[in-house]
Amino acid sequence: KAFVFIENDADFLLHRLPEEVKTAHYHDDETHIRTLLELGGLQPKGGMALAAATVRGLILTVSHQEQIGVLYPQVLETLVRGACRELFA
């Protein structure tokens, strides 16, 4: 249920923050993912934008665990392995 809040209300809350706070502390997903990949010495084949969008897609599956059912852990692992194979193999 917490991820439903995040999906629906994060944008609203972000707009309420003062601009200087956002400038100092908020970065888009791609910035954080780029930093993590660079620290690991990884360069995704499809580029950073694709890697960031893929990670966002994987994160969004968390809010659909109930619909996916008891196989969610295996489904997520399959998706992650496939994404890694496509981006880095």
State the predicted function of each range.
Residues 6-13, 62-66:
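Secondary-structure edge/capping motif, primarily at the C-terminal ends of alpha-helices
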